[in-house]
Amino acid sequence: MPDAKKQGRSNKAMTFFVCFLAALAGLLFGLDIGVIAGALPFIADEFQITSHTQEWVVSSMMFGAAVGAVGSGWLSFKLGRKKSLMIGAILFVAGSLFSAAAPNVEVLILSRVLLGLAVGVASYTAPLYLSEIAPEKIRGSMISMYQLMITIGILGAYLSDTAFSYTGAWRWMLGVIIIPAILLLIGVFFLPDSPRWFAAKRRFVDAERVLLRLRDTSAEAKRELDEIRESLQVKQSGWALFKENSNFRRAVFLGVLLQVMQQFTGMNVIMYYAPKIFELAGYTNTTEQMWGTVIVGLTNVLATFIAIGLVDRWGRKPTLTLGFLVMAAGMGVLGTMMHIGIHSPSAQYFAIAMLLMFIVGFAMSAGPLIWVLCSEIQPLKGRDFGITCSTATNWIANMIVGATFLTMLNTLGNANTFWVYAALNVLFILLTLWLVPETKHVSLEHIERNLMKGRKLREIGAHD
């Protein structure tokens, strides 16, 4: 009995280590999102570019990410989750090198597209891999660790941007990504491949070997393998399954909708244009804007711990609903303050408090939980196709948000822009209550059975 307990502890440690290494992809994702906020003013100054070109510098990465996400389904299915992560790490190294050395804005935009390809591969593969590796009781927490790494990456980028801002060294801001990219590349060599990918390839011995390393007991590993075998009895897969099976189409639709909801909360507007938003709040000094951006990043990291604590205790659906409510309030009040005018130090502090409240709402809910849900709701035979659709949607929506914010400010005005995002968050509360299932402590195979039986989307996580 003591040996069994010792083995269980050893396997838990191994599972955590594997999940941590995979989540490092999120760190690079976050660094890529964060570095451009601080570098953009210096890039605009050096290359003398317009607001429209600045939007392209920001959104070119999202275009690359959408392309990378679309290609990742095929890549992940053919080569496996591990090799896909390896390819993503190589692209991160190459993209950051070219970005830092860009002689003109055209090369910089192309380099950002290359980085986007890396982010697309990572944002597709890492949550999928984590959902297939982690045991059901901690699956939400482990996938949320990926989002935590994103927020740590954003904070790290803001800190390095602030450090380099005193000399305007934007090339160093963009170049720091190389170091963690190399660490990820080394770390991936130590990862096992997904047991569900092995099973999909009919390599059941390999699947069992991985499960025996990662589960507390051999009985638990064998039970999980039996459930995986059962889910493989569906004859069609991918596009064929999408065409023939209306229940699978519902899951793909929900995944796409969830990613649209995440992006149109307005969070990445703040991530990409944080210094600009601080300027709107009355902070005209560049140093104040940069340190304000660091506070945004730190709040994002700390609030993500709330999600990790709640996701496997309180559940996905109530946490998500509360988050959208907090974000709607934050954006609504911020828009009202922009309308009235921010003329005093106390008004400035209150505006920043509303901004930080919005960030807490996102980081505790839509930030991690959308990735959790999208990786849970797709059936095994259609998982690569379904997550390709949802991840590509994430980046297309992300690109639209990044490419339109400055235009919205110029055409709608500051207050109306923030009110639009507040109204969208209210809409997302209603959509969550209507469509989103509770998947806490439910196996992926049980969710799949409910989906394929034709149960309502909001009920596919229900126990029989």
UniProtKB/Swiss-Prot annotation:
Compartments where found: Cell inner membrane
Q: Which GO terms describe its biological process?
A: galactose transmembrane transport; transmembrane transport
Q: Which GO terms describe its cellular component?
A: membrane; plasma membrane
How does the UniProt record describe the way this protein sits in the membrane? Answer: Multi-pass membrane protein
**What is an example of a GO molecular function annotated in this UniProt entry?**
symporter activity
Q: Where are the transmembrane segments?
A: 16-36, 57-77, 85-105, 113-133, 140-160, 172-192, 251-271, 291-311, 322-342, 352-372, 395-415, 417-437
Q: Which residues lie on this side of the membrane: Cytoplasmic?
A: 1-15, 78-84, 134-139, 193-250, 312-321, 373-394, 438-464
Keywords on record: Cell inner membrane, Cell membrane, Membrane, Sugar transport, Symport, Transmembrane, Transmembrane helix, Transport
Ranges in the topological domain labelled Periplasmic: 37-56, 106-112, 161-171, 272-290, 343-351, 416
The record's family statement is: Belongs to the major facilitator superfamily. Sugar transporter (TC 2.A.1.1) family.
What does this protein's UniProt record list under function? Uptake of galactose across the boundary membrane with the concomitant transport of protons into the cell (symport system).
Q: What is this protein called?
A: Galactose-proton symporter
Whose protein is this, by species? Escherichia coli (strain K12)
